[in-house]
Amino acid sequence: MHVLLIAGGWSEEREVSLSGAKGIEQALLELGHDVEFVDPAKDFKNILLLAEHADFAFINLHGSPGEDGLIQAMLNQVNCPYQGAEPESSFLTLNKAATKTVFDHHGILTPKWELVCAADGCKGLQDLEPPVFIKPNSGGSSLGMTFARTAEELEKGIETVFSLGDSALVEEYTKGIEVTCGILDGEPMPLILINPPDNAEFFDYHSKYALDGAEEICPAPIDPVLTEQIQQITAKAHKLLGLTDYSRADFIISEGVPYLLEVNTLPGMTPTSLVPQAAKEAGYSFNELIAKLIELGQRKRK
């Protein structure tokens, strides 16, 4: 097949996207596909033309224009199949506040949170006080995320987030252990336990991508009953958000209770990223995972 590999883009996660695309391209070539690469930041105006002549588009974008559903909507214009969520579900899930509203409405536990708009700043906070996490309302890879122990740190953290966007999600600090659960073709995969470095407050950008980053253990050495509970929550959230093919849900376990933090519609796809790690434990090599995602993407268009 002629596969259009879409990576790069203009979000803060551009370099992560390009890094992951290298391994995907190698896998596609080894699977016997013809690969054409396009970076929306450099050749946006030709995407529809390229997609129209492709048999499949493999999306490896983080943030806009991939996780917000823009590229998917464009691919739908020319009926080019792709892996992952449709535009509407992508747009909904990238917005952390909207996603947490869905969790709250359907009884899925998530840490207490508030949405703060740039026009209001810290004055927009009604109930939460430090310690809290401050996150960009849209985005991933923990870019711009800060941990505030004091009111002064909270104000600085919100200012940092407002330099990246017009809204911030402030989330109550929940002490516990971090785990992640991927889902592939409707089936939850083995959990991964994440141990950030000793000097990290959370699973930040450095922990995710540096060689001396977090320790990741798969399968997670936690109680089987709790494991099954987290897998069930992952499947429920995946369905409620209208996601397809695959996704990854991030949790914090506090005193034996799992709290769902967020869901990723285009999770990292380097061979050592979390979803490929879990897929390997489930019996898929990296190349087999890529092949499976192509199969799932094509199935949706039939």
From Swiss-Prot:
* A GO cellular component annotation in the UniProt record: cytoplasm
Role: Cell wall formation.
EC number(s)? 6.3.2.4
**Pathway(s) this gene product operates in, as recorded in its UniProt entry:** Cell wall biogenesis; peptidoglycan biosynthesis
Q: How is the cofactor bound?
A: Binds 2 magnesium or manganese ions per subunit.
Q: Which Pfam families match?
A: Dala_Dala_lig_C
Start and end residues of each ATP-grasp domain: 100-295
Instruction: Please name the top-level EC class of this enzyme.
Output: ligase
**Which keywords has UniProt assigned to this entry?**
ATP-binding, Cell shape, Cell wall biogenesis/degradation, Cytoplasm, Ligase, Magnesium, Manganese, Metal-binding, Nucleotide-binding, Peptidoglycan synthesis
Q: Check the record and name the SUPFAM superfamilies matching this protein.
A: Glutathione synthetase ATP-binding domain-like, PreATP-grasp domain
**Record's subcellular location:** Cytoplasm
Positions of ATP binding: 126-180
Q: Which gene is this protein's source?
A: ddl
List the GO biological process terms: cell wall organization; peptidoglycan biosynthetic process; regulation of cell shape
Q: What species was this sequence derived from?
A: Maridesulfovibrio salexigens (strain ATCC 14822 / DSM 2638 / NCIMB 8403 / VKM B-1763)
Query: What reaction is this protein's catalytic activity?
Result: 2 D-alanine + ATP = D-alanyl-D-alanine + ADP + phosphate + H(+)
This protein is called D-alanine--D-alanine ligase
Q: Which PROSITE patterns match?
A: ATP_GRASP (PS50975), DALA_DALA_LIGASE_1 (PS00843), DALA_DALA_LIGASE_2 (PS00844)
Q: Where does Mg(2+) 1 bind?
A: 250, 262
So where does Mg(2+) 2 get bound?
262, 264
Please give the family membership noted in the entry. Answer: Belongs to the D-alanine--D-alanine ligase family.
What cofactor does this chain's UniProt record say it requires? Mg(2+); Mn(2+)
Q: Which Gene3D superfamilies match?
A: 3.40.50.20, ATP-grasp fold, A domain, ATP-grasp fold, B domain
Keyword hit for Plastid: no
Query: What's a single GO MF annotation on this record?
Result: metal ion binding
